[in-house]
Structures are given as C-alpha cells and as structure tokens.
Amino acid sequence: MKINGTPYRTIWLAKDGRTVEIIDQTRLPHEFVVVPLASLEDAAKSIKDMWVRGAPLIGATAAYGMALATLADASDAGLERAYQVLHATRPTAINLKWALDEMIAALTPLPVPERSAAAYARAAEICDEDSAQNAALGEHGAAIIAAHHKAKNRTINILTHCNAGWLATVDWGTALAPIYKAFDAGIPLHVWVDETRPRNQGASLTARELNWHGVPHTVIADNTGGHLMQHGMVDLCIVGTDRTTRNGDVCNKIGTYLKALAAKDNNVPFYVGLPSPTIDWNVADGVKEIPIEERSDREQTHIFGKTEDGVVREVQVTPDGSPAVNYGFDVTPARLVTGLITERGVCEASPEGLKGLFPERA
C-alpha cells in the first residue's frame, strides 16, 4: 500500500540484507517511525510490545526473527531456543506458531552453514505469500460489496472492528482488503470504524489507513454499532481474525462478539476475512480451546493522545485504586458468522464450508 505516494509493506529487509525494518505501530497515527530489528531479541520485543500486531504480521515478523536468530546460532539448539522465545511472545494469534513451524520445517533438514540464507529466503516467501493471499481474498470480498451495491444502488456502509488492514498484515489486510479492492474499482462505500478500546486500534490504525487511501470513513465509539444497525445504517460487517477454528468459530479483538450479536439481531451480514494460515485445524471449540491473552491493566486505565501543543502524552482515565482487567480477544461462535472470506473464496463458517475450500485438510 502507499503512504503519501510511497509504496510500503509493514515489514521489509534493509539494504544490508540482514537487518529487518518495521513500522512502529505504537507511534501511529501521530508519528511515522521505522524501527530496525537486528536480533532475535529485537524481533521478540517488537511482537510482545506490539510495535507489530495483527496475526499475519506477527507470523511474518516471527519468521524474520528466526532468520535473525540464525546469524548468532543456526544450530539445532539455537533454532529451538529462537522458536521458544518467539512462541512465548503472544499466545492467541495462530499465525505465530504456523510461521515458526514453517521455518523449522525448512531449516532443520539443512546443514548448519546453509540455514541462515535459507531462513531469510523462507521468511521472504512467507511475506510474499501473505500479500498474495490477502489480495486474493480482497477480490472475493469485493464481489460481496459489489453485489450489495448492485442490489441497493447507493453507497454501501460497512462496519469494521479493530484494525485488520494492511498494517495488520504484510500488505492489503484481511477485513480491509475487500474494502480497498471495491473502492479502487469505483464502488461507492463508507466505513464505520470502531475505535476499539483499550488500545484504540480502530481509531489510531484503521482510520489512519483509510485516510491514507482516501476511503470515506467515520470513527465511532465502540458501543455505537448496535444503534447504527437498528436504524439501517450498516449494510454489512467485515472483521478480521487472529485464529479461526476448523468449525468456523472466530477469535478476534475483544468486542467482536458483541458486534456479531447485534448484526444477527438486525439481519446485518457479518463476514470475516482471513488468509488460510489463520485457520487452526487442530481446534474445534473456540470458546473452550483458544487461549485468550490478558494484557496489562495499564492499557485500560491509561490512554495516549496528542495535546493541542502537538505532544503525544499518556494520561490516566480511571480513579486511583480502581482495578481493571484487559482481555485482548473474544470468540464469535460460527452460528453468528455469515461467511468466511479466504484466498480461495467465500465459505460457510462450518467444518463442511472450510473443507469445501480446503479439501486437503479433510
């Protein structure tokens, strides 16, 4: 995607061929800062501290983290240590484990001296694959938006939650890829952007992306979506996912479940965009089996913003002594999902639907 006319991905190899560079997303929307990653520890910190986030981008960063680790120690023990360090950073996004498993499978059969070059090559492939998958699912999702426009012959209003745009992936995004593809094809649309507390990733990241791309959008408080749906102001919802089970349960940013309930009650289609590495074929019941990350309560009790003098500051929004809890994700049962938008097409959120698109997993 482009920022002020310059094409960017969210992660890329620096000119030295060894250092990896990322956009520090904790500094957005007010600052655009590129950060170099030169070691396994740098990569792990970038994931844990959410300089990068979004399931596909976490996976891509972990892949490059493995490559960086081989510069210091490409032995079997070194690979195992790197795997464990990176795997421990964030528990919910399945792309993290998927990417690490891909790297181990590619590297362990090779002689130690050949592993570093192979690691960088496989990490680059994972990034390219993610971009291609997201572009493809974007086309499938854009067809859904086009069908709504054809039926209603007016601007289509789409509600999204958190950030599942290109900042959450290597490029294009998941939930936002259909929006970008449809917008670029000339379909009139407007996006309702949930602010997505407590980290405000909708207000800070999704709005920033849509602004860069010129897509009409409006930021709303998290609890506004139901009201909009009741009054016919939402034509469809499209969200992303950090892990989707083989039965079609969808784990995504906290608050997604409530949007799906409101959509169901108001007959608003609720779609989920995901590349296939986000499917966890080993898990059936998302509510019971997916580990839900619990983050620092400080994210709930404090908030960042830009003051009138242009300084970005953190302020406390809760009383001293009030405890807070900060679950990062929730699970939307498959019965509330209209369809899953993947790189192979759109399917029902069910074992049969997923196996129809991915028969090799049957």
From Swiss-Prot:
Enzyme Commission number: 5.3.1.23
Source superkingdom: Bacteria
Alphabetically ordered keywords of this record: Amino-acid biosynthesis, Isomerase, Methionine biosynthesis
Pathway: Amino-acid biosynthesis; L-methionine biosynthesis via salvage pathway; L-methionine from S-methyl-5-thio-alpha-D-ribose 1-phosphate: step 1/6
Record field: transmembrane: none
GO terms for MF: S-methyl-5-thioribose-1-phosphate isomerase activity
Biological process according to GO: L-methionine salvage from methylthioadenosine
Enzyme class, UniProt record, top EC level: isomerase
UniProt-annotated binding residues for substrate: 53-55, 90, 201, 252-253
SUPFAM superfamilies: NagB/RpiA/CoA transferase-like
Swiss-Prot/TrEMBL catalytic activity: 5-(methylsulfanyl)-alpha-D-ribose 1-phosphate = 5-(methylsulfanyl)-D-ribulose 1-phosphate
Residues of the active site: 242
Keyword ATP-binding: no
Stated family: Belongs to the eIF-2B alpha/beta/delta subunits family. MtnA subfamily.
Functional description taken from the UniProt entry: Catalyzes the interconversion of methylthioribose-1-phosphate (MTR-1-P) into methylthioribulose-1-phosphate (MTRu-1-P).
Name used for this protein in its record: Methylthioribose-1-phosphate isomerase
Originating organism: Paramagnetospirillum magneticum (strain ATCC 700264 / AMB-1)
Gene: mtnA
